[in-house]
């Protein structure tokens, strides 16, 4: 069996003008990534081909879906269905898990 203990918050850093992403697991359309955004950084509008969950490890982010927006803070989880256009704005230096299944 394979076991690996990781310190999630230490896997990525909040670097100025750089979105940092580390792929933890990936298989075809599915993934489990950790992403770091500096305050005011934006991940531009996009969609996912599979259902997605975002779990905030640290900081505060805002996810925009057309006319709706959700603010997520440390410890909060947002799940959404595939094919929805959205963008992400970091309201504070933030780290979050991106889970696509």
Regions inferred by a protein language model and the residue ranges of each:
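A short, N-terminal "cap"/entry segment at the start of jelly-roll beta-barrel domains
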Residues: 1-29, 64
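Conserved short histidine dyad/triad with adjacent acidic residue
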Residues: 18, 33-48
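Glycine- and acidic-residue-biased ligand/ion/polar-headgroup-sensing regions
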Residues: 50-62
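A cytosolic small-molecule/anion-sensing beta-strand core signal
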Residues: 57-58, 73-74, 92
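Short acidic-glycine-tyrosine-enriched beta hairpin
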Residues: 67-82
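Ligand-binding loop in jelly-roll beta-barrel domains
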Residues: 82-101
């Amino acid at each position: 069996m394979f076991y690996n203990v990781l310190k999630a918050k230490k896997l990525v850093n909040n670097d100025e003008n750089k979105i940092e992403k580390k792929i933890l697991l990936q298989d075809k359309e599915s993934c489990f990534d950790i992403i770091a955004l500096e305050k005011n950084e934006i991940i531009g509008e996009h969609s996912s081909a599979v259902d997605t969950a975002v779990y905030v490890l640290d900081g505060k982010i805002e996810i925009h879906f057309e006319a709706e927006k959700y603010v997520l803070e440390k410890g909060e989880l947002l799940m959404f269905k595939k094919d929805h256009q959205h963008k992400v704005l970091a309201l504070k230096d933030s780290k979050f898990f991106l889970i696509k299944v």
